[in-house]
Each structure stands twice: as structure tokens, then as C-alpha cells.
Amino acid sequence: MTAEHFPVTELAKDLISRPSVTPLDEGCQTLMAERLSAIGFNIEPMIFEDTTNMWARRGNQGPVFCFAGHTDVVPTGDISRWHTPPFEPTIIDGYLYGRGAADMKGSLAAMIVATERFVTKHPDHQGSIAFLITSDEEGPFINGTTRVIDTLEARKEKITWALVGEPSSTLKLGDVVKNGRRGSLTGNLTIKGIQGHVAYPHLADNPIHKAAPFLAELSQMHWDNGNEFFPPTSMQIANIHGGTGASNVIPGALEVMFNFRYSTEVTAEILIERVEALLKAHELDYDISWIFNGLPFLTGDGPLLDATRYAIHQVTGYDTSPQTTGGTSDGRFIAPTGAKVLELGPVNATIHKVNECVKVDDLEQLALCYEVILEQLLC
């Protein structure tokens, strides 16, 4: 059997062919549920507004090993720039092309196939295996994993270890696993002024001029030094808007959106206090609101990281590098429950781009890694 016809490749193609642009699922979870139900999983759909979620579990005892992931994908972008139609999975020169190939339908296929193989070999495995799948990871993440976790917490159902299938690898499969993520905090700031004619500045109050010294100081502030696991906290101004578009009107307000990616050396509360103290020091008239996107988390040495290191070495022959760089993932909603969380998935070079693709051989290797991890933890 060639790699093009491995079970993991066939399942990945079936998932990719479903145009599940967030928050749509387009039957992906039904397909997964059918495969899992056939090997003894209890399937629990959880529908919250426009979002399709699935909690599937095999076993009633702890520890609970959970595969976590998402069936939704980002929009395709300009279809004319794709070599092949984004929802018609195509293999070219050993790569599987299609939206979601790397992020993260390839991982979902590898999870299912690995679990099928594991259960066939070890029908009386220890503990429980679970799947937490959502169609709201690429969107506003309001009705997805966070709502499922709330449901599980309310009935005191705990996850021991969670493996998220996000594309963690950089140059080759398994070279990087994410064993933590920085926290994310967004500020939406409005600096108030008085609109007027540019020829009569004494009758107006320009919020851009007033805010400029504050923004300059904010952008130069030192927040912390990071630590051995996390880089220093960073702040980036993402959007600035002021004015009517006319050259002869002083704007009445300036809107600024900025985002922190912060380490465990600070808290969101400390960052908020420092920003608002700076606003007051510059004597600005302002409104500000804050969006908490996720707390930082870290999974150190222990059974999950040990099993993942071992699996990658056994399958690929090289050692992995645990890192906390990059954006946020749904792991940030699982970690606060006390679960240990890691991310392991394909190479991320083409995610969210046109011509997204994944190496076909990598999908089979990823399934093998997942299977070895299960064996290390539940046998």
C-alpha cells in the first residue's frame, strides 16, 4: 500500500472535501463520530448556537487522555491563486493539498486512525480515551471548546492529559511540540477629543496629538524579562483609526487596538494597571475595554511530555524541542482545569495560506506518534 492510500490519507481527504469554513462543520464530526462509535466510544454532540461540538469518550475510569482539535477552517482566500480547488483534496509530488490539510484535518485523521489501531491492539486499555472537537476554533471561540469545558466542569468530568493536534512542527514532523502558550490580552482604547476645523485648532482638541506621546511611551515600555520557558512579554499596536477621511477636519476621537502576549512573569491585572496608570499620567480623556483571550500555561516534565518525546524519537529517530512560541490555541481553555496540555501536529509552513498542504508521509508518521503516546500512557 502506498502512502497515498493509507487509511489516514483517505480519511484526511474525506474531511478536507467538506467546506467547513468557521463556524461550519459540514458533517466532519458525524464522520468522526461514526468511526469512534464503531470502536466503543460514547458520542455526545454539544451544539451551542452556530457551533457544532463533540465530546466522545471510551471508558469510565481515569486517567483520561483527550485528543482535542477543530473541524473548522479559515476562508480560502483568492481561489484563483490555488493550484487545485481548495476543497478538492489533491496529492501532488507527495503532498496533500487542500484547505485544512495542515490545520488541522490531517491531525484529526491521524487521531482517529491511531485510536482505531490502539483499541484493536489494546481493547482493555487502562483509563479512558476522549475526543473534544469543535467547529469554532478559527472564529470567535465563544461557543466551542470553552463551552464544552464548562459543561464537563459542571459535572466534574476531568481531563488528565490533552493532546491538541495544532500544526506545531516547523521544518519536519515532530521537531517542535508546544508545551505551553503565552497569555493573550487585548485592549480597545478610545482617546476623546473635540472635532473641529483644522484652520481653527484653538476651537478643537486633537486626540491624535494628545495620544502620540502616550503611544510612543507605551510602545517602548519594558514589561518583563521572560523566563526559561517564555520569551519576554510583548505589546503590539494592531489597529489605529482616527479622522473622517477629510484633510480639513480635526477628529473627535482616536481608536487604538493593541494586544499583549504575556509570560508567566506578569498577570493580566498587572498589565492593565500599568497601562491605565500611563493613561492617567498623560492626563488623557479615555474609555478602555479589555478582552481576556487566554491565560498562559505550561506543561513541564511528566508523563505526557515524556510519552510524547519518546514517541517522536521512536517514530522519527530524532529528538523534539518543547517550545511556547506562537499564537494561542484551544489548549488555553483546557489547561485551567488542571489538565496537562501539549500540541503536536504537522509542519505549519502553509497554514492559512493559499495552497495549504501537508506531506502525505507525515500524516502516517503522525498517526504512529499518536498511537505510541497512547501506548505509553494507557498500557
Curated annotation (Swiss-Prot):
Pathway: Amino-acid biosynthesis; L-lysine biosynthesis via DAP pathway; LL-2,6-diaminopimelate from (S)-tetrahydrodipicolinate (succinylase route): step 3/3. Zn(2+) 2 binds at D103, E138, H352. GO terms for biological process: diaminopimelate biosynthetic process; L-arginine biosynthetic process; lysine biosynthetic process via diaminopimelate. Its cofactor is Zn(2+); Co(2+). Binds 2 Zn(2+) or Co(2+) ions per subunit. Zn(2+) 1 binds at H70, D103, E166. This is Succinyl-diaminopimelate desuccinylase. Homodimer. Gene3D superfamilies: Zn peptidases. The active site is at D72, E137. Belongs to the peptidase M20A family. DapE subfamily. InterPro entries: ArgE/DapE_CS (IPR001261), Bact_exopeptidase_dim_dom (IPR036264), DapE_proteobac (IPR005941), Peptidase_M20 (IPR002933), Peptidase_M20_dimer (IPR011650), Peptidase_M20A (IPR050072). Pfam families: M20_dimer (PF07687), Peptidase_M20 (PF01546). It catalyses: N-succinyl-(2S,6S)-2,6-diaminopimelate + H2O = (2S,6S)-2,6-diaminopimelate + succinate. Catalyzes the hydrolysis of N-succinyl-L,L-diaminopimelic acid (SDAP), forming succinate and LL-2,6-diaminopimelate (DAP), an intermediate involved in the bacterial biosynthesis of lysine and meso-diaminopimelic acid, an essential component of bacterial cell walls. Keywords: Amino-acid biosynthesis, Cobalt, Diaminopimelate biosynthesis, Hydrolase, Lysine biosynthesis, Metal-binding, Zinc. NCBIfam families: dapE_proteo, PRK13009.1. It comes from Shewanella sp. (strain W3-18-1). GO terms for molecular function: acetylornithine deacetylase activity; cobalt ion binding; succinyl-diaminopimelate desuccinylase activity; zinc ion binding. Coiled coil: none annotated. Its EC number is 3.5.1.18. It is an enzyme of class 3 (hydrolase).
